[in-house]
Swiss-Prot record:
Subcellular locations according to the entry: Cell inner membrane
Bilayer topology annotation: Multi-pass membrane protein
InterPro entries: ATP_synth_csu_bac/chlpt, ATP_synth_F0_csu, ATP_synth_F0_csu_DDCD_BS, ATP_synth_F0_csu_sf, ATPase_proteolipid_c-like_dom, F/V-ATP_Csub_sf
Annotated site residue numbers, Reversibly protonated during proton transport: 61
Record family assignment: Belongs to the ATPase C chain family.
Chain's gene name: atpE
Organism: Erwinia tasmaniensis (strain DSM 17950 / CFBP 7177 / CIP 109463 / NCPPB 4357 / Et1/99)
Cystine crosslinks: none
Protein name: ATP synthase subunit c
GO CC annotation: plasma membrane; proton-transporting ATP synthase complex; proton-transporting two-sector ATPase complex, proton-transporting domain
Alphabetically ordered keywords of this record: ATP synthesis, Cell inner membrane, Cell membrane, CF(0), Hydrogen ion transport, Ion transport, Lipid-binding, Membrane, Transmembrane, Transmembrane helix, Transport
Keyword Cell membrane: yes
Annotated GO MF terms: lipid binding; proton-transporting ATP synthase activity, rotational mechanism
Organism lineage string: Bacteria, Pseudomonadati, Pseudomonadota, Gammaproteobacteria, Enterobacterales
Length: 80
């Protein structure tokens, strides 16, 4: 029974990290598409749009990093 609980913890951590990565990839793809759409519609606003794009992209990209940290915590600290 002990091994089953450990296996479930490892699977939960893997699923958490995988879903966070997939969600971030989808989010960055949508964000990039909207950035290109906005840049095509209003080329004068490209510097402003680029700044906002990189800020929001950093926020979207932070979610998988947090999930990896939590997943590693679950795998190595909780699973002892």
């Amino acid at each position: 029974m002990e091994n089953l609980n450990m296996d479930l913890l490892y699977m939960a951590a893997a699923v958490m990290m995988g879903l966070a990565a997939i969600g971030a990839a989808i989010g960055i793809g949508i964000l990039g598409g909207k950035f290109l759409e906005g840049a095509a519609r209003q080329p004068d606003l490209i510097p402003l749009l680029r700044t906002q794009f990189f800020v929001v992209m950093g926020l979207v990209d932070a979610i998988p990093m947090i999930a990896v940290g939590l997943g590693l915590y679950v795998m190595f600290a909780v699973a002892k």
